[in-house]
Amino acid sequence: MVAGWLTNYSQDSVTFEDVAVDFTQEEWTLLDQTQRNLYRDVMLENYKNLVAVDWESHINTKWSAPQQNFLQGKTSSVVEMERNHFGEELFDFNQCEKALSEHSCLKTHRRTYFRKKTCECNQCEKAFRKPSIFTLHKKTDIGEELPNCNQCETAFSQHLHLVCKKTSQNLHLVCKKTHTQEKPYKCSDCEKGLPSSSHLRECVRIYGGERPYTHKEYVETFSHSTALFVHMQTQDGEKFYECKACGKPFTESSYLTQHLRTHSRVLPIEHKKFGKAFAFSPDLAKHIRLRTRGKHYVCNECGKEFTCFSKLNIHIRVHTGEKPYECNKCGKAFTDSSGLIKHRRTHTGEKPYECKECGKAFANSSHLTVHMRTHTGEKPYQCKECGKAFINSSSFKSHMQTHPGVKPYDCQQCGKAFIRSSFLIRHLRSHSAERPFECEECGKAFRYSSHLSQHKRIHTGERPYKCQKCGQAFSISSGLTVHMRTHTGERPFECQECGKAFTRSTYLIRHLRSHSVEKPYKECGQTFSNSSCLTECV
């Protein structure tokens, strides 16, 4: 009806009244429900045909304001009549049976519905919301060629996307940057060239420490949205890429690539300003935050640098001696809340971090991380002097102090020197009667917590260290170490006098007495070089 007439719009000028039917209030009251429904269907059909030929673009110039309002879903005399006579029924759209709470929502939905339905391809029955996309689809459906990039043959939807306005080259701007490797955006921090403004923004976030993307469930922040997406996959347990060398799984191929560098020791990411290389880009970012002036917080006392003010604030308490977090069980105080939380687990016995390999549980996540290396064999801390590797940083630091031969911590009673203050504190207990670690089962006390842990296995019968050769188990690791020498034949403790070797240091000490006149055990007038001979005499 209307569709055929509208094709001749360019020749004949018309008014809104040519396609619209209107009633007075008196005439409207004479219509029954069926007639009113018919009227509404006819008007909607007319509107559908108008949208089909993109008639909305002509409304502003050819039709009056009331007519525009009707076709664009705004208030008109027809809509007012429907509102008066139908009331709430106006908001139930009869085409898709969707109910809407507001009249404005109905108008928007009606316009979207008919536009979607009218932009429908007769060839493949696909429907489109926008006439421009529908027009493009019709071109591809009839075999019309789209404009292509003359270097990679990528097709684009419109010529204006393809032609560069500055050079008039037949090449899409984004595609042009890909082929020419153009990098017009330069980071002021690292002087790196970047292909787009979005890449520049991400680079600025890395240097500034900005992390705008937050995971609501785990309260973690990320510098860009892709990192947040990968993190969410990790939390869901999705792991896709596996290392062929060690079997470690990763959620992203880029993570696997970074991990492979740990096997090959390749350090491809270099910072231009400082000349230092890194295997992982996050390590570079961390290094930058610590080295770049103006983007960190410095302690005035010792010069130590921090990436955020809260960490600096906690550090300052080391100098002031302030410990605001106190344990209500034993009175021990800490500089930060995390230290108190970890300490409380020593009273409650809580060990929330469990190893999935052997089931062993730990009070701190860092202890679990170190423990996992005993299963994987990973030793990330390697000494450059002798090549010896360690599973944790504390062992590595202790080892590094052995090379210069410096032992700054001296015992005032016996003169023995130590490389760490903690070792000296432990040693001082050998001069005193202090035994702070007591067994709850039998009351026996020990100088060191490790000795108490070993002792408890006597009560529990636990023997976690098992020989893979013969199956014999031991309660302490040193017992397994000594036992393994019976299989390997190793005798590392050798006498400098006669060359005789032993599997244990205690055996060597006892043997050395045979070369000296030392006989410390005295009973019944006789002297003995070792306790076993004394036992036989008794």
UniProtKB/Swiss-Prot annotation:
Gene3D superfamilies in the cross-refs: 6.10.140.140, Classic Zinc Finger (3.30.160.60)
Its keywords, alphabetically, are: DNA-binding, Metal-binding, Nucleus, Repeat, Transcription, Transcription regulation, Zinc, Zinc-finger
Q: What processes does the entry annotate via GO biological process terms? A: regulation of transcription by RNA polymerase II
User: What is a GO molecular function of this protein?
Assistant: zinc ion binding
Q: What is its main location?
A: nucleus
Domain of life the protein comes from: Eukaryota
Give start and end of each KRAB domain.
14-89
User: Is Protein biosynthesis found in the keyword set?
Assistant: no
- Where do the ZnF regions (C2H2-type) fall? 91-113, 119-141, 147-179, 185-207, 241-263, 297-319, 325-347, 353-375, 381-403, 409-431, 437-459, 465-487, 493-515
- Gene Ontology cellular-component terms listed: nucleus
Tell me the compartments it is located in.
Nucleus
Q: Which InterPro entries match?
A: KRAB (IPR001909), KRAB_dom_sf (IPR036051), Krueppel_C2H2_ZnFinger (IPR050826), Znf_C2H2_sf (IPR036236), Znf_C2H2_type (IPR013087)
Its job? May be involved in transcriptional regulation.
UniProt family annotation: Belongs to the krueppel C2H2-type zinc-finger protein family.
The name on file for this protein is: Zinc finger protein 559
UniProt organism field: Homo sapiens
Q: Which gene encodes it?
A: ZNF559
